[in-house]
Design a protein with these regions (language model features):
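Flexible, surface-exposed loop regions and adjacent strand-edge segments
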Residues: 11-22, 62, 71-76, 110-120
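Residues embedded in well-ordered secondary-structure elements
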Residues: 31-33, 45, 73, 85, ...
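C-terminal beta-signal and adjacent terminal beta-strands/loops
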Residues: 63-64, 86-148
Length: 148
């Protein structure tokens, strides 16, 4: 379990464009984007035999801000993985991993072009499509490792 609160210090800037328009940003004391305040990680594993291991991984990421102004954010989410690893012999390992076995859906990271959106402006983006990163979908992955 981790609780953290990283904030920006001395993070402000302004610019005047050729047409005289001015724009500025002040992120002082705002929580760093993409860094959740709460992290929980649970990683149980069980050796069924000395050559066969079953494992799970549950990772919780709390509310995460998507831009500098703390105007856009992602709700907390779980990321889940699980798998089986089998050491067939001293030269061959086989594995299967299931990614996102709870089939969680949602976005993470940042939203492109949103850096300067303020809390007052955020409501105008409700219901709009925006580009960003998304949670990995439910997948099953197979692996083999051969040692000489």
């Amino acid at each position: 379990f981790t609780y953290q609160k990283p904030v920006y210090k001395n993070y402000s800037a302004s610019v005047t464009f050729n047409d005289g328009t001015q724009m500025g940003v002040n992120a002082n004391n705002m929580i760093v984007k993409e860094i959740p305040q709460t992290l929980i990680e649970l990683d149980p594993s069980y050796n069924i035999t000395k050559d066969l291991r079953l494992w799970l991984s549950f990772r919780y990421f709390g509310k995460t801000y998507a831009n500098l102004q703390e105007a856009l954010y992602f709700n907390g989410r779980w990321e889940t993985f699980g798998g089986v690893n089998w050491a067939v012999n001293k030269h061959l390992d086989l594995g299967v991993t299931v990614v996102n076995f709870l089939n969680q859906k949602g976005a993470k990271g940042t939203i492109s072009g949103s850096e300067l959106i303020t809390k007052d402006e955020a409501s105008q983006y409700a219901g709009c499509y925006m580009s960003g990163s998304y949670l990995r979908p439910f997948t099953v992955e197979f692996s083999a490792s051969l040692r000489f």
